[in-house]
Amino acid sequence: MIENRRGLTIFSHTMLILGIAVILFPLYVAFVAATLDDRAVFETPMTLLPGTQLLENIKTIWVNGVGVNSAPFWLMMLNSFIMAFSITVGKITVSMLSAFAIVWFRFPLRNLFFWMIFITLMLPVEVRIFPTVEVIANLKMLNSYAGLTLPLMASATATFLFRQFFMTLPDELVEAARIDGASPMRFFRDIVLPLSKTNLAALFVITFIYGWNQYLWPLLIITDVNLGTAVAGIKGMIATGEGTTQWNQVMAAMLLTLIPPVVIVLAMQRAFVRGLVDSEK
């Protein structure tokens, strides 16, 4: 039992407040920069008081983008959403069916196949990414949604998590389904899926954020500005050489990019937390 000491309470709350301040201060600076005009954002030191140009900056990047040959930011956001949602649905579908087959079907070398999937976690991304790009290029899938999403739909981690959960389900459920004459897919649809809802919610949130925050993969696969994603697009807004970066518009784009993941987390936070807790049981 932890003693309720006043000094310990003050210390822990102080550290909590400091941690929150460290995390939120860069976001506040980005928000302030997004509200300033082109002149004020380059003042040294930059003011920490919000300006009045937030909506104007958002409107500019939303319709026109930033820089030369830049796509409208709404199109980048749409591409990011399509990519994140497709990866999420595909990853959950592939992982659930793979884990279901490994746990409930009896076929030769099924455990070997699982460990072959699992061992891919030991390979760094840098080792896997360039052979994957070569495959996508040979399949003529560069500059396409298929090239953006299909290679990221397989997940050893998600397959492992679903496998561990399925192994906790009692064998009596399988026997009851067999007695009722249920097919494997009916057993999956009517019994396994409802029992997996909390795990699905947790994995949906994690995978959506993973897909939304993809940076390196879109840079390697996409050269068409109209297929660019928001995260990679922000990097393209930063001028190189003698160009001048419109930091107020870049920060406005960053704030817009934060909205979808935050909405997903807030909308599914209860199911997300419950899924994480259930996965540890």
Swiss-Prot record:
Q: Name its cellular compartments.
A: Cell inner membrane
The record, for InterPro entries, names:
MetI-like (IPR000515), MetI-like_sf (IPR035906)
ABC transmembrane type-1 domain boundaries: 77-268
Please cite one Gene Ontology biological process associated with this protein.
transmembrane transport
Recorded superkingdom? Bacteria
Under the heading PROSITE patterns, the entry gives: ABC_TM1 (PS50928)
Q: Name one GO cellular component term.
A: plasma membrane
Q: For this UniProt record, give its keywords in alphabetical order, as a comma-separated list.
A: Cell inner membrane, Cell membrane, Membrane, Transmembrane, Transmembrane helix, Transport
* Its membrane topology: Multi-pass membrane protein
Span-the-membrane segments of this chain are: 16-36, 85-105, 113-133, 142-162, 202-222, 247-267
Matches recorded under SUPFAM superfamilies: MetI-like
Q: Name one Pfam family in it.
A: BPD_transp_1
UniProt similarity note: Belongs to the binding-protein-dependent transport system permease family. UgpAE subfamily.
By its UniProt entry, which PANTHER family does this protein fall under? ABC TRANSPORTER PERMEASE PROTEIN MG189-RELATED-RELATED, SN-GLYCEROL-3-PHOSPHATE TRANSPORT SYSTEM PERMEASE PROTEIN UGPE
Whom does it interact with, and what assembly results? The complex is composed of two ATP-binding proteins (UgpC), two transmembrane proteins (UgpA and UgpE) and a solute-binding protein (UgpB).
Q: What does this protein do?
A: Part of the ABC transporter complex UgpBAEC involved in sn-glycerol-3-phosphate (G3P) import. Probably responsible for the translocation of the substrate across the membrane.
Q: What is this protein called?
A: sn-glycerol-3-phosphate transport system permease protein UgpE
The organism encoding this protein is Salmonella typhi
The gene that this protein is the product of is ugpE
